[in-house]
Amino acid sequence: MRWRRRKEGRKRREWFSGAGCAAVGGVLFLLGVVAYLALGNALTNARREQVAKLKERIREAGQPLTFEELNAYYPAVPDEENAALVYQEASVLLDAIDPNGATVDALLRSLELSSRNDASLPELQQEIGAFLERCGGVFVHLERAATLPKARYPIEFSVGPTEAPAHYGYLKRCLRLEKLRALHAILEGRQWDAAPCLERMQHLAESLRDEPSVASQMLRAAYRGEQITCLKAALNVAYLYPETLADFQRLSLETSDPEPMVRALVGERCYWVEVFETPGAIGRVSAMGRVLDYFDPAGQSTMRQ
């Protein structure tokens, strides 16, 4: 009897130390996997519900979630009121005179490195004047564009932030041409003619105001900043009247209106929603680690305050 009990105890110990232990471990592992998957599924469902509720708030706010909706969100402008079309026409004329803006850049660089006492300044003034005379047709278009209050550029939203729209380049060239024109007026003692040039520079920058893109709003701010660099160059080559300084101050102040950046964030959010929900709709998808949670309508209200 005692021998039988010892034999049974030895079998139990062998079971727990061998195959039995492995079986228990396997069961525990499977239970852990099931628990992990169940938790992951619960978290995924919770996240989906959160995203669905966010989309509902976005829809209620009348904001877009697809490229088609984003295209409608960027206000349409009749051709006869669209400054963007006139800027495009001006750029075609300017490219025929100064391809890629090389001459304007060189003349501005020379001016920015000059001072009032430079002996070469009169010669540079004549060179600038001769170049500006060739740009008369361009100025006609730029002056006409400045009278139009709205602008809408042809932009393909599905391309996303991987390609710069064509109008970024030609707007910069037109803006720097107006900057050169303002500095030339100051050099010739016609400081009262500088203010209209600065106003056209401002109008050109503000033509990007409604574009729902962060890149466009950053460029808009950079283009507004060109007025500051214009003032710096003007102070190097001339004594400015108080009225001229007042014009620079009035036209160089940055607006505190957050609405353009709110629109830009709406556009960026729309792009990334498309990236993750319908990646085939994107021209080229940038490699990004994750999508940032951009402002929902409640966050935008806070931003506007």
Each model region followed by its residue ranges:
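Short acidic linear motifs
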Residues: 2-305
